[in-house]
Amino acid sequence: MSYLQEVITDVLENYPDKIERLVFVTTGKRPALFLKKHFAEQVKHATIAPEFIGIADLFTRISGVQPISNLPLLFEFYDCYTKTCKDTPDSFEEFLSWGQTALKDFSEIDQYLVNPDKIFPYIHALKEAEHWSGMDELSEMQKKHLAFWNSLGDYYFALNSKLTEMGKGYGGFIAKKAVEKLPKYLQTHTNTIHIFVGFNALSKAEQHVIQSILMDIGGEIYWDGDTYFLNNPTHDAGFFLRKYTNSWRYYQTHKPKFIQSNYEKEKELYLTGVPKSINQAHSVAELLKNTPTKALEKTALIIADENLLIPVLQAVQPKTSVNITMGYPLQQTPLNDLFVAYFRLHLSKSFYHKDILNLLSQPFLHTLLKEEVVRDISQYIKTHNLTYITRKKLFESVDETDHEMLTLLFPDAKGKALITTLIDNAITLIYRLKAQIDPESNTHLLTQEYAYRFFQLFNQLKQLQEQYGYIDSVKTLYHFYLDVLQKSSLNFRGEPLEGLQVMGVLESRSLDFDRVIITSVNEGVLPLGKSGDSLIPYDVKHVLELSTFKERDAVYSYNFYRILQRAKQVHLFYDTEMDSLKSKEKSRFILQLLAEKISTHKVIHQIKAPEVYPAILRPLTIEKTTAVIDALKVLAEKGISPSALTTYIRNPLTFYEQQVLHIYEEKEVEETVEARTFGNIVHGTLEDLYTPFLNEILTEEHIKKMQPLVLPTIEKRFEEEYRSTDFRTGKNWLIFNVIEKYVRSFLALELNEIKSGTEIIPLYLEQKIKIPFQAPHLPFPIYFKGIIDRVDRRNGVLHIIDYKTGIVEETDVRIKDWNNLITDIKYGKAFQLLTYAYMITKHLNINEKMIVANLSFKRLQKGLLPFHTYFDKEKDYDVTAKTLALYSEYTEELLREIFDINTPFYEKS
């Protein structure tokens, strides 16, 4: 028989003819529902049913004060604060950092019946002592800090006065008023028998009310305690019950009811450590899968960490219905991601490109925005490399027919009007999203539920903003939204009388199950651990007997062990994973269970690692089909670049992805100059500077003419690449200066060459070339194409120069073993240089020796780094017909492999 069944049995035995006078008072609605069920099962004759209410409803009834919800309370408090504050009050955004904490403290002060005339001066005196030094005068900040503590009591009294006027209150306010109004309630309810069920930790107000009712008009309180904990003076699970049985006047003449001995009965306790939360979910799913259907009806799955609810539900495939009774954080829902993205977007005057793309990529908007609208905006931003974009430009990027929906996301408003519009538009978005929810979807009911919760939130926010107008910026709105969401949850309410019961720790109060599964039994979750979420110093709380972390730990201890009391089989899962900040420490409750050594308890502790199957990595190969060969023919006709050929040498599979499938990394907006753009700007600047002097012998005067043009030329090239970005700040400005240094150093290098007597004639700059590769055994014509950075004659010798903004070593442009030219990527730069040499000889139809070289801007002091090889063990820098004949022979072999249908593309390791 469960605890609640035993309560009903005992009450019916003691009050068989007074049933209609009974009022059952419980910790919440769920125990009340089970009490009703057991009452109906045990009463065998027709009778007027007793009343079942929660303790909060009883206090509301006694006090005559209606509860006020958190948001209106916060706004009322700020209103009282601004009218009471003697100095310049904090902005609403600043107030949010301490306002909710103060309200929580006010409620606790009232619940524990602490005299406000004493506690606030006490806190102020302590704070004053902290700042006292005896000599130094207080700073303005210290004075303001002390003024706050001196005024905290004024804020409390102002709020209390306002709430009294409204007839509404927070929890502690209602409890205090209930104590004040209790004598009248007792006078008018002498015929009522109150039955208090399932309580443990009680505030002073609750203790006073319950004791007074029991002693003055009669009734019972049924504890759910166990002698094992009560008789152990150091065990936290019995902390409150020991305290009440020893200190209540009621127990001077009465014995505590329902202190039983269930915990030491036979139990199986399985304590399982599992790495990562997701593996806990899978372990639970496996456990439930192997559980008979009938046993599931007597099983409770308790989710200690609410963030694990969805992973567990996704992993579980139950044989019976699943009924969830717990809260799920609204901030974990997909709809929250949409509104976070929505508000973040409007934090600055211009729209940041990442915020736009983040908003437009939200799954919920896919049903409201046409796919091409998202694509067009994304393409416009990336094509124009826009870091920030104005509303006007954004709307110009799409068709006018799509402006109406975009107006919801990007409203044309400013100041407080923008705040109102954003809230209104959020409500409109919810309406439109609700209309698009697919009723056939497995999740449509859940989606509707959290859409409604967001609607409630924004609707209430709209009313409060209209009434008070305290939110004066998008930043305040955004932070307020985040603050509210952090404390908001979606409350699931299932059918609690049948099926597998899934619940949180608090929802399990007063309920009993034969089999219990609890997840996340880790320190910081169960128990929660120390929390500094209070303005009241610990010493003050301790002296005035307010709740501290010690009492909170005792609450967690009771709740945990109460779940275990009547269970026959218990499965506790904890996370063993270590992250970068801290290890996931097993809960102290698990350590206690391991240390207890109770003979009737079978304790099995295990660490369960997920099965890992070693991956067998086989090199990926792609067979060539006729379609692939057709695509290669198109490529051959358009022209293959030297860099594409080196890509094949590096990894044929990458060549296939890029040149056949045309899979490249998606173009992104560059907020800071990337390597490709860096190179483009350097190349473009040198092209602009040298173009006026093509086919002329460079002189010192030419270089001197270029020098004052360096800065404006770089600026022009930057502006072409970054049309909307101010490159004169941050990293881009540093990179701008690096490019300027490179270009000026290059001109200085050229000037030194000229001064030393080198005759330089620039012939081509950034020259585009497309030529056929001539070889007798190719299956079809193949063209090479590319851009040669610079072609000079230096002292009459043709020089082909390939700029490199990275580092180039001499070994990179050297060939020792020609057999590795088309197989080893270390010859990649040398292969590219030879390809440029081959292309220029065909393009100019020449047959002369030449120098082909890299020029590394990071190693300008080394000058040109020319290709060289070895013939008859002699180093040779000249690229001649002999050199190019060797190159052609190996390159033909490479091309035959690329275009051979029988040679697959393969992945190089």
Identify the meaning behind each predicted range.
Residues 140-162, 190, 197, 217, ...:
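Accessory C-terminal helicase-associated subdomains
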Residues 54, 193-202, 300, 305, ...:
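Conserved helicase core region in the C-terminal RecA-like lobe
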Residues 337, 350, 354-358, 522-639, ...:
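Accessory/regulatory regions of helicases
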Residues 127-128, 132-239, 273, 514-515, ...:
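Conserved helicase NTPase motor core
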Residues 83-115, 191, 314-322, 354-453, ...:
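Accessory helical subdomains and C-terminal extensions of nucleic-acid helicases
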Residues 1-51, 55-57, 187-348, 511-512, ...:
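Conserved motor-region signature of P-loop NTPase helicases/translocases
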Residues 29-189, 204, 381:
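Basic/charged alpha-beta structural segments of nucleotide/phosphate-handling enzymes
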Residues 438, 517, 580, 619-909:
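RecB-family 4Fe-4S metal-dependent nuclease core
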